[in-house]
């Protein structure tokens, strides 16, 4: 079906990602998955990605082929990450942010009243990298309130947001 859609619509990132998802469901080898994934990003003019070996979920094995070209500006970017019961996913999200080509950043993990061990995970991540700060809201107030609390604490010239269950390409920022 995807090949047929490609003949009708040409190449597109959406079709390539659909091909990637289908290949995962078909349990294609890691090398095949890496080839498809690399092509998606190369076609978009971005650094290609691949999958690291292992048994972790695909999301946790995304990796870049080479280190991204470091950004030259020193403007601080604040990345606000609302966190609610995301202990299992938060490390992948934060590591993808810390691997950005733009290193002049702060990552604000705003714990929004999590009832799992998200706060402890966030605090552990903050001890591993000085660019990570934890803000504790105490009770669940919702993602918008968490983002607003992060904005009040942000020190960056530029501010962006990132969900606690997301992964970012190394050239996002």
Question: What residues fall within each predicted segment?
Answer:
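Acidic donor-binding/catalytic loop of UDP-sugar-dependent glycosyltransferases
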Residues: 117, 166-173
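Glycine-rich, basic loop-to-helix element that forms the pyrophosphate-binding segment
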Residues: 137-154
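Donor nucleotide-sugar binding loop of glycosyltransferases
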Residues: 85-89, 114
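Short, acidic, metal-binding catalytic loop of nucleotide-sugar glycosyltransferases
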Residues: 95-104
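Non-catalytic membrane-proximal stalk/linker segments that position and tether the catalytic domains
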Residues: 3-75
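A conserved acidic beta->alpha catalytic loop
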Residues: 111-120, 139
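Short aromatic/hydrophobic "clamp" motif used to bind/position activated sugar donors
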Residues: 159
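Active-site acidic Asp-centered loop
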Residues: 112, 162-164
